[in-house]
From Swiss-Prot:
It catalyses: a quinone + NADH + 5 H(+)(in) = a quinol + NAD(+) + 4 H(+)(out). NCBIfam families: PRK06076.1-2 (NF004741), PRK06076.1-3 (NF004742). NDH-1 shuttles electrons from NADH, via FMN and iron-sulfur (Fe-S) centers, to quinones in the respiratory chain. The immediate electron acceptor for the enzyme in this species is believed to be ubiquinone. Couples the redox reaction to proton translocation (for every two electrons transferred, four hydrogen ions are translocated across the cytoplasmic membrane), and thus conserves the redox energy in a proton gradient. This subunit may bind ubiquinone. Belongs to the complex I subunit 1 family. It is an enzyme of class 7 (translocase). GO terms for cellular component: plasma membrane. This is NADH-quinone oxidoreductase subunit H. Keywords: Cell inner membrane, Cell membrane, Membrane, NAD, Quinone, Translocase, Transmembrane, Transmembrane helix, Ubiquinone. GO terms for biological process: aerobic respiration. NDH-1 is composed of 14 different subunits. Subunits NuoA, H, J, K, L, M, N constitute the membrane sector of the complex. GO terms for molecular function: NADH dehydrogenase activity; oxidoreductase activity, acting on NAD(P)H, quinone or similar compound as acceptor; quinone binding. It comes from Burkholderia thailandensis (strain ATCC 700388 / DSM 13276 / CCUG 48851 / CIP 106301 / E264).
Length: 354
C-alpha cells in the first residue's frame, strides 16, 4: 500500500464522509505551496543563469550563495504601498491582478505529476487547461483599461492581440496531440506515448510525441513563450517604449501578482509541453523506470524553463509587426499543414499511433 493510500484510508476512518473534502483541500494547499516555492526559486535560477551567461555571479548577498534572495524580494514587495491612481476604476483596477493569478493556479488541477497523482483526473483535461489558461488575457485588458492610462492601455491591447494570435497555433498543436492520443485526458495522453516500437525495445524517449510531431512541438513551445509575454516577445512591457505596459501604474503586491502569474504560466507551459510531447512522468529509458515518475517530470520541466531563460538572455526583442507576422504567416500555416499531414499519416499503413 502506498503512502497516499495509507493516508486516505486512515483519514476516511477518522473523519468519515467529510474526509474527501478535507483530503481535496489538503492536496490543493500542498500543490499551491509547492508552486509558490517553485516560482520563488525559478526567479533566483533565472537571475543566476543570466548572470553566468553575462560572466557575473548573480544574487549572492542574502543567505548562503544568495539562496534567501527570493524571501527578501517577497518581504520588500509586501512592505510596499499599493498605489491607486485617482482616475482609475478602483475595483476593476484591484481585481485585475487577482484575475491573472487564479487561472494560473487553476490549470494545475488537471496536470498529472505521475501515474495516479493528479488533483482532478477529468476526461476533458486538455480542453480544461486550454480554456482556463486563455482567461488571463481578460485580466490583462482589464488592468490596462481600469488604469485609465494611455500607456497601460496600449500595452494591454498589444498583449491581447499577441495572446490571441499565438493561442490559435497552440490550439492546433493540442489538436494534433488529441488526434494521435485519441483522448483529452492528460494521463491517457502520457500513457499513449509509452507504446510503440522504440518503447518495446526500452528506448522510451524515441516513442514520445516530440519526434513525430517535432515542428508542432517547437511551435507550441515558442507560442508558449509568446503567450507568457516573455522575451523576445515582451513588446507588451518593452522597457524602451512603454516601460511596464499594462502594469505601469501597479506597485507592491498588486504588481507582484502579475509577475507571480507570469512565472506560474511559464511552469504551466513547460509542464504541459513535458506532458504532451516529452512523455510526462515516463523515464527516457526502461532501465531507469525504478526512479519515481515525478522526478522525470520535474527534470523535463526544469530543462524547458531553462530554455525560457536562455531565450531571454540570447535573443533581441522582436518588433510588434514581426511578432504578428510570425504568428499568422508562419506558425498558423505550418500547423494547418501538419494537421493534414498527420491526418493522412494516421489513415495510411504507416500509422505509428495504432
Amino acid at each position: 500500500m502506498s503512502l497516499f493510500d495509507t493516508i486516505n484510508s486512515g483519514g476516511a476512518q477518522l473523519l468519515g464522509v467529510a474526509w474527501p473534502t478535507v483530503w481535496a483541500l489538503v492536496r490543493i494547499l500542498v500543490v499551491a505551496v509547492v508552486i509558490l516555492l517553485c516560482v520563488a526559486y525559478l526567479i533566483l535560477w533565472e537571475r543566476k543563469l543570466i548572470g553566468w551567461m553575462h560572466v557575473r555571479l548573480g544574487p549572492n548577498r542574502v543567505g548562503p550563495a544568495g539562496l534567501l534572495q527570493p524571501i527578501a524580494d517577497v518581504l520588500k514587495l509586501l512592505l510596499k504601498e499599493v498605489i491607486h491612481p485617482t482616475a482609475a476604476s478602483r475595483w476593476l483596477y484591484l481585481i485585475a491582478p487577482v484575475m491573472t493569478v487564479v487561472p494560473a493556479f487553476a490549470v494545475w488541477a488537471v496536470i498529472p505529476f505521475q501515474a495516479g497523482a493528479v488533483l482532478a483526473n477529468i476526461n476533458a483535461g486538455l480542453l480544461y487547461a486550454m480554456a482556463i489558461s486563455s482567461i488571463g488575457v481578460y485580466a490583462v485588458i482589464l488592468a490596462g483599461w481600469a488604469s485609465n492610462s494611455k500607456y497601460a492601455f496600449l500595452g494591454a491591447m498589444r498583449a491581447a492581440a499577441q495572446m490571441v494570435s499565438y493561442e490559435i497555433s497552440m490550439g492546433f498543436a493540442l489538436v494534433l496531440v488529441l488526434m494521435t492520443a485519441g483522448s483529452l485526458n492528460l494521463s491517457e495522453i502520457v500513457g499513449s506515448q509509452q507504446h510503440g516500437f522504440f518503447a518495446g525495445h526500452g528506448v522510451n524517449f524515441l516513442s514520445w510525441n516530440w519526434l513525430p510531431l517535432l515542428p508542432v512541438f517547437v511551435i507550441y513551445f515558442i507560442s508558449g513563450i509568446a503567450e507568457t509575454n516573455r522575451h523576445p516577445f515582451d513588446v507588451v512591457e518593452g522597457e524602451s517604449e512603454i516601460v511596464a505596459g499594462h502594469m505601469i501604474d501597479y506597485s507592491g503586491m498588486a504588481f507582484a501578482l502579475f509577475f507571480l502569474a507570469e512565472y506560474i504560466n511559464m511552469i504551466v507551459i513547460s509542464a504541459l509541453a513535458a506532458t504532451l510531447f516529452l512523455g510526462g512522468w515516463d523515464a527516457p529509458f526502461e532501465f531507469l523506470s525504478f526512479i519515481p515518475g515525478i522526478f522525470w517530470l520535474v527534470l523535463k520541466v526544469f530543462a524547458l524553463l531553462s530554455v525560457f531563460i536562455w531565450a531571454r538572455a540570447t535573443f533581441p526583442r522582436y518588433r510588434y509587426d514581426q511578432i504578428m507576422r510570425l504568428g499568422w504567416k508562419v506558425f498558423l500555416p505550418v500547423c494547418v499543414f501538419w494537421v493534414i499531414v498527420v491526418g493522412f499519416w494516421m489513415m495510411s499503413p504507416l500509422n505509428i499511433w495504432k
